[in-house]
């Protein structure tokens, strides 16, 4: 310990002599090791040959009334810290501190610029995606409208052709109707007689079928012997009864035709053959 203290004193004397002789560069950079009211700072000095002079640690005080000690003052306190490695002599601590300060600012600026670039690229990608989606949707809408337009045109064409065909059919039917009216003319007395026979037969049929009501349900019973069929409507029971009797009361209205039918609708359907309606059934 005593040996180290002697070495420090010797270096301090050498430093004082060199500072008075002006053989070193007096410019130095320091840093504060503590953030309190008092602390130490290290002074780094380079000689004219470029060699690093061992660092000196000086005390400092934040008190504004305190006077800083100058390097030429013999009363300033300096010490050489024990236990420090020789690597500190190779690289100036002040340069390291200054570089760390500027490097942190540089990295912060570079990070901010990089973030702005990424944000701008992300916004550009979003805009491109929205534009692409807009094009896709618009394309589908246009395609749908085009398909609807084609379908509507086809429907219009089909309706036009249908009107033309129906017009031709109605024209032919009108001409055929005029001929049928002339060919189907019959004496008024004959038609009245046939109508009377049909009506009387219908009345006779109606009186044949007794009406029943059971628990609010209507029904007509078949009058044929041995048949127990009951149907809810008169028309149905009539059709059923004709199966038993084999009656064909409805004769064709054409005087040249002798066909007879069990139902009036069947007779009228047959009568259209004589009126040239067979092509339109």
Curated annotation (Swiss-Prot):
Span of the signal peptide: none
Gene3D superfamilies per the UniProt record, alphabetical: Classic Zinc Finger
GO terms under cellular component: chromatin; PcG protein complex; transcription regulator complex
The entry's keywords: Metal-binding, Repeat, Zinc, Zinc-finger
Compositionally biased intervals (Basic and acidic residues): 1-15, 59-88
Chain positions of all zinc fingers (C2H2-type): 220-244, 250-274
Keyword Repeat: yes
One Gene Ontology molecular-function label: RNA polymerase II cis-regulatory region sequence-specific DNA binding
Region (Disordered): 1-23, 55-88, 168-195
UniProt keyword annotation of Cytoplasm present: no
Name the UniProt record assigns to this protein: Zinc finger C2H2 protein ECU05_0610
């Amino acid at each position: 310990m005593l040996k180290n203290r002697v070495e420090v004193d010797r270096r301090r004397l050498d430093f004082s002599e060199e500072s008075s002789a002006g053989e070193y560069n007096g410019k130095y950079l320091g840093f504060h090791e503590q953030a309190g009211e008092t602390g130490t700072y290290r002074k780094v000095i380079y000689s004219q040959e470029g060699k690093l002079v061992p660092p000196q640690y000086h005390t400092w005080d934040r008190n504004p009334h305190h006077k800083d000690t100058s390097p030429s003052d013999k009363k300033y306190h300096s010490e050489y810290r024990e236990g420090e490695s020789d690597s500190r002599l190779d690289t100036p601590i002040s340069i390291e501190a200054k570089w760390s300060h500027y490097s942190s600012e540089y990295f912060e600026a570079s990070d901010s610029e990089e973030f702005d670039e990424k944000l701008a690229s992300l916004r550009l990608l979003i805009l491109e995606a929205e534009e692409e989606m807009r094009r896709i949707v618009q394309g589908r809408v246009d395609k749908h409208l085009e398909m609807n337009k084609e379908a509507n045109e086809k429907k219009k064409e089909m309706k036009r052709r249908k009107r033309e065909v129906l017009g031709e059919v109605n024209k032919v039917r009108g001409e055929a109707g005029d001929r049928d009216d002339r060919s189907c003319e019959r004496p008024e007395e004959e038609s009245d007689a046939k109508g009377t026979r049909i009506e009387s037969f219908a009345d006779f049929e109606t009186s044949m079928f007794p009406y029943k009501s059971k628990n609010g349900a209507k029904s007509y019973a078949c009058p044929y012997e041995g048949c127990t069929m009951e149907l809810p409507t008169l028309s149905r029971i009539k059709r059923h009864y004709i199966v038993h009797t084999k009656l064909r009361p409805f004769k064709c209205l054409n005087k040249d035709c002798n066909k007879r039918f069990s139902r009036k609708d069947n007779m009228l359907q047959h009568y259209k053959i004589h009126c040239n309606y067979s092509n339109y059934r």
